[in-house]
């Protein structure tokens, strides 16, 4: 049985130290390579798989959603981005031990990428939005 993206068989120790097998987190077990990239020559109407030697500077680069089956949990892709979200990962901050991931729509620089991590007060309130298509 699954609750969200976390299997009930996941141990508490794994939640605190290792998320390689169950989440889209910093120490995940998969990697993104050029084989996962695509490019478009017609402004996004059609996408072609890129290789290292492809000319991928024509009209944009796309990291394809669901580049392989390991990117999908329960058939849903790319649910991260444009807002912070709480994770089940722990960090070393004794006052805020839970970790959030992702950037905020009004942040810039190193705080913006979806793979950024941090800790913040759980009572922080900021309006955010996320567009989802499926």
Question: Which positions does each model-derived feature cover?
Answer:
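Disulfide-stabilized, aromatic/cysteine-rich ligand-recognition loop
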Residues: 64-71, 93-134
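Short, well-ordered surface patches within globular domains
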Residues: 1-63
